[in-house]
UniProtKB/Swiss-Prot annotation:
The chain crosses the membrane at residues 17-37, 106-126. It is a multi-pass membrane protein. The lineage of its organism: Eukaryota, Fungi, Dikarya, Ascomycota, Saccharomycotina. The keyword rRNA-binding does not apply. Partially overlaps MAL11. It comes from the Eukaryota. This is Putative uncharacterized membrane protein YGR290W. Residues 38-105 are cytoplasmic. GO terms for cellular component: membrane. Residues 1-16, 127-147 are extracellular.
Length: 147
């Protein structure tokens, strides 16, 4: 196999690996984004959701205020939510932390992708300048010098 064809297969494989890793990173960062938001909502300052489902009552001074209902294992559909100022500030801070994590994670993979693609571009450009056989493969007709 020619070294140019091997480099073409290698660059194609690198492109597919970088694309797959970028998709995997975006999926992982979105999962981390969702889990960070749910963790911030279920932290120690917020109510315990398992207790809330079992007891089905919560005081209005806390983060959530439910419609009064009897003690049952399932929350009734007639409940309403009021979010206090402290919980909204905590939610916004965790939202910005998760957005920053998502942005930095994606930017790292895009910087790596563009670095490798620029490296491959410069390799091919330098190979075209130094190796005249590549110029012959670009042209469809060979050049003949007439006397």
């Amino acid at each position: 196999m020619d070294h140019r064809a091997a480099f073409g297969y290698f660059s194609n494989a690198c492109f597919k690996v970088m694309l797959f890793s970028s998709l995997l990173a975006s999926f992982a960062s979105s999962v981390a984004f969702i889990s960070l938001i749910t963790f911030s909502l279920s932290s120690s300052e917020s109510p315990n959701w398992a207790e809330l489902v079992v007891n089905s009552k919560w005081s209005s001074s806390k983060a959530l205020s439910f419609f009064p209902s009897s003690k049952s294992s399932v929350l009734k559909t007639s409940c309403w939510f009021t979010i206090s100022l402290e919980d909204s500030e905590m939610f916004l801070s965790s939202f910005f932390e998760a957005a920053f994590f998502l942005l930095t994670n994606e930017m790292i993979f895009f910087i790596l992708y563009y670095f490798f693609s620029c490296l491959m571009f410069f390799y091919v450009a330098s190979e075209r300048n130094t190796n005249p056989k590549i110029l012959q493969t670009i042209n469809t007709k060979p050049l003949y010098i007439k006397n």
